[in-house]
Amino acid sequence: MNKRSFSRIGSARRCGALIGLACLLAGVPVHAQSPAVDVLTTATPIKHLVVIFDENVSFDHYFATYPLATNTPGEPAFHAAAATPAADTLSAAHLLVNNPNLTNAGNGSNANSFNGSVAGDPFRLDRTQASTADQNHAYTAEEQAYDGGKADLFPRFTGKGTPGAVGAFATTAQVMGYYDGNTVTALWQYAQHFAMSDDAYTDTYGPSTPGALELVAGQTNGMLIAATTQQPSTVALPSFYVNDGQGGYTLINDVDPTFDNCSNQANVAMMSGKNIGDLLSAANISWGGFMGGFDLSVTNPNGTTGCLRSTQSPIVANNVVDYIPHHNWFAYYASTSNPGHVRPSSVAAIGSATDAANHEYDLNDFYAALKAGNFPAVSYIKAPAFADAHAGYSDPLDEQRSLVTLVNTIERQPDWQSTAIVITYDDSDGWYDHAAAKVTSSSFDAQADQLSGAGSCGSGTQPAGVSGKPVNGRCGPGTRLPFLVISPFARANAIAHERISLASVPRFIEDNWLHGQRLGGGSFDVTAGSIASLFDFQAPPRPPLFLDPATGDRVK
């Protein structure tokens, strides 16, 4: 593996070739570049970072048998390149059969009640099974499922079944299901053409809100409660927080943000530290968080509007509310929030620190900025909920349509030549993954922590909270996630094995635009691994890869 450090290099000749290719593509709209962004000093040739942050997928849930797909007749076929490197997958670990979740009696008969002894083993989900149950992905439940690193109690602690289904799909053993390249075809194609990590984790255990905060701040401590009906989390009655042991609180589960008019005001919280948006604003670098459903003035085709805008998904057979407040990274911070969902004053103002929208936008605004050539330096993207992959209300096929449409659009712009797209997820949803990271940040809450025994997650040092003192509630690394980089500068058909986490994203932003400035206040950006090994800035640039949103196949 040729791991290269970030370095500034000349790239005008190569970029010109990419613009020429884009202009020659028939039917592709080509818009102006973003001149203000392009002249910013960066440590790499990357002038634009787009972070597509989807929901609730473990690495093995999507890549258990990569790069080998079953290729069942009638499904989009996937055939890997001959030189595809090996990844740390279920199949490579020889855990598709005789899995420890089958042999551990602690999972009980519930996991096996329909499908015999096979139910505790991993099993393939096909395209007709795209709609699944939402698994238990709470902080404590995930620790219990990983069972001291043995990863053998998933059906017992995180598994849920689909009522009315048959076989393992109807039981808690559904948590052992995985897709292959016949369903998540686009992601497998991106992994073939660009770069992927098989060693990316959440920074702590737990669901969406902790993951969202880690992606922008690397810190879940320093939570302030604005209103709550709940007590600190226990095994019997989980809640969104624990006492941190220093007189404050650490957020460990989902809760709506204080600074959002769409939040459930009975339970809302805010964060007291800094996030990456604060650093970018201080440096006058354009950025934005773009979320499906954020524009409350829009009326959807089904007549819904405001906070309850929704979209019908035939796959999950439901109307799904587009915007979910507890997924909104920046609404937990007074400095980067837009409580009233105020619209930007113009497309030209998108990304600006002086506009009333305060960097919080609808996903449609991102497309408008692309079309206008006003592409922010840093963009965080959240799809409408029906397309964000979250089991229970979304699915991998709706996700693929949204994801591929967005990536195709970015690749058609001249700014593609200086863009990196990161695709990753906020948490694992509790889906089985065989890889258990060694704990590097311990926690000893008497109730919430159960990984190494009652009241214990690891045996080492507690990480620092916002005050600089060691705190509870930040046990990790947590669960393993897909993490892909799509860019002209991504390594080709490459798998990086260096440990990274969600906090590696703000670290990259800091290294590329902010001269290595860190957030401070105990943020994991200091210790998070670098994503440098996913790039090669000295190789010829990668061409864009256009895919069919419906099938994930390459567009000929």
What are these regions (language model features)?
Residues M1-S11:
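N-terminal secretory signal peptides that target proteins for export/translocation
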Residues G10, I19-G20, A133, W513:
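A periodicity- and composition-biased signal for non-globular, repetitive helical segments
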Residues G16-G27:
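Bacterial N-terminal signal peptides
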Residues A32-K556:
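N-terminal pro-sequences and low-complexity stem/linker regions of secreted or lumenal proteins
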